[in-house]
Amino acid sequence: MAFVHLHVHSEFSLLDGACRIGRLAARAKELGQTALAITDHGVMYGVIDFYRAAKAEGIKPIIGCEVYVAPRTIADRVHGVDNDARHLVLLCENETGYRNLSYLVSMGFLQGFYGKPRVDLALLRQHSEGLIALSACLAGEIPRRLRAGDYDGAKAYALELSGIFGPEHFYLELQDHGIPEQREVNRGLLRIAQETGLPLVATNDAHYLTREDSELQDVLLCIQTGKTLDDPNRMRFETQEFYLKSEDEMRALFPALPEALENTQRIADRCKVEFEFNHYHLPAFTPPDGSDSLTYFRRMCDEGFRERYPDAPAGYRERLEYEMSVVEKMGYVDYYLIVADFIRWAKEQGIPVGPGRGSGAGSIAAYCMHITEMDPMQYHLIFERFLNPERVSMPDFDTDFCQLRRGEVIDYVMGKYGKDHVAQIVTFGTMAARAAIRDVGRVMNLTYAETDAVAKQIPATPHMTLDEALRISPQLRTMVESDERIKKLVDTARGLEGMPRNTSTHAAGVVITANPVSDYVPLARNDETIVTQFTMTTIEELGLLKMDFLGLRNLTILDDAARAIRRREPDFDLKRLPDGDAATFAMLGDGKTAGVFQLESAGITGVCVNMKPQSIEDLTAIVALYRPGPWTPSRALLRTNPTRSASPISARSLSRSSP
């Protein structure tokens, strides 16, 4: 039987694991292995990326986590006692196991966090189904007791874990990284196995891909702990053996225990978790009048249509009927109702709401339901840009709220659908080129001036890499070629560049789910905010409903201004301001764009000065063209139409500029 790595830390064991997801499965394939696990410390951030990468390499992905177990219970929080959590490896045998692991990891953050996200034995008892447990490294409870000379306690704890997870679902984990203590612990584990019949499994606590990568992992730990490489008391691994080893290397470590090695393959064969992508899991909306969702949706559209278009021109009603049929066929009726409901609530509370932005503004149904306030028919907007029956994809209304009161809308949604059904979305800060240089420079104990001199040779442009900087900067190449310390700095930074460094919260994204969010994705806590452990892109790929709740300071500014005006003109209403005010367009043409949404940057202000916009259509053309994609071929157009009316800019000129 083949050997399978069941204890592996990726780059998502933040500032600890140095195994890049993109290389992990490829390395396992190079070693001739057929399956591979991911078991990051207390988190599941990298699970989906790992799953996809493994599948792409023909490697069977095994989903897991090395959880932290509280010494007593998650309610106990005595410093020096309860913050010293024990390790336990959990692997998902099936979908039930995945849901249980997702729940356990989530509860570690939401209920058990004390220095680290912790679970306890009570939680494990309640959510053990579908999970296979391994006793973990020297930081596991059983190895700790063995190291303390408490053999009977170690044996009792092993039997307790076996009772929690069930027969053939708990394994005593043997490791050998050349550490004398570990070999002593292994002798105790072998004795427990002989006396209890508990099965053994051999693993390597892989934190990096090759022996040579141990230096990168050492640097990561220094970044994490704020230490330098010349500090003899820094936290560091004792040997360079914590890498993804070959089967031959593992068999050489445990020549007398082939069963422990073969059990890795037996466990891998039992682990069968598959993720389904682009299958949507939308929450249901409960209409307040007791009707079904479709009836309520059509009623809202019909009533809104009569209100919006008392004298509807020809074709408008047909457009609404078409949109309603598409929304129904594609299964997004509840989505429209959910969005309309929280926008209605926000407006009732006096929370400033944007008039509509993005492709959703092209929906007449959304306009009739007061989701948007711009008439798509007046501006000839296309519904299929938002929902296309020939290209099934999740719709996405961009909803903007006053920056100061956005949280109230999220609280309303949580109250309506349940706190465990709503979460915000994680983002990751990564070590960009300049940041990697500065981090590694500190760790190498270079002076600030030395590190800063190197960092300043890296252009401050988006997505700049060290390789690209070396290609375009002769000064940087000279520094690297003339100073071995600088070469070491740059080479080390290249090894870490792009790795995740920290987590944050997405500025707008909110997930609403039919079942508790942790049934689908694990959760974490960023400060006081509950977030998914998967990024926005992954959330959408898993078919979950992602809403954009963007807090805009521009709406706050407008609301403050309107309140000030109403002190002198009580009837003032922003909605009654004309769209074609000549004085306003003159100000924009003069470059007075401070505080104007999407027109504030120096570049687009210059375009406004050049173009002299005279209508909403002109502004539409400017905003549409001034973006990374179409901007380059349209640069000449935006320079050479300084005083044209809306028609030549938005129609004839745009067609001339098409590549």
Feature map (PLM): residue ranges:
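Alpha-helical scaffold/interaction cores of sigma-54-like transcription cofactors
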Residues: M1-P659
